[in-house]
Amino acid sequence: MFGYASNETDNYMPLSLDLSHLLLIELAAIRREGKEMTYLRPDSKSQVTIEYNEDNVPVRVHTIVISTQHDEFIVPTEQTHEAQMVADEKMLSIIFEDVKNILIPRVIAKLPERLKALFDDKLILHVNPTGKFVIGGPHGDTGLTGRKIIVDTYGGKGGHGGGAFSGKDPSKVDRSAAYAARHIAKNLVAAGVSDEVL
């Protein structure tokens, strides 16, 4: 079992995971508000890649990947493969521009100044890179328990013992020992003993 903490963020989580969560929280808020990006559906995922310097200090947000479920809001007038491809490309283009011009600025606005400075014009943005994403949630993925164990912890930074947390009571060390190790790591970083603990 592993516990991890870092002083990169106020909640002692890795910056890449924290930004990824914030992107999805804000995307869900936009969907619930229902004023912009009205085609959004509930399923989504994100990944953020951070560039670090030699001293392991974040220097910039390198890449953001956002995949978001959406309505099929552009329907081709003809029932041909070519017409469907054109409609799909238009949808994906609109979604890309909305993520770039609506979602990303809203997320940046909520960040502390030191993190806002990590966003630059070299940011690589991938939106729905595998194409349209109309079918999602349990309809698109069956068997949701224990499938995303890395995102349940530290997003690839730090370690993971391999066991899922879902569906386990506190007597199972996969869950309880990982929580205890995180508690220890977080308190060591919060006390200033170290910048990062695993």
Q: Which functions belong to the PLM regions below?
A:
Residues 52-55, 148-153, 197-198:
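Short, functional N-terminal and low-complexity linear motifs
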Residues 105, 109, 113, 156-160, ...:
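Conserved helix-loop functional segments at active or binding sites
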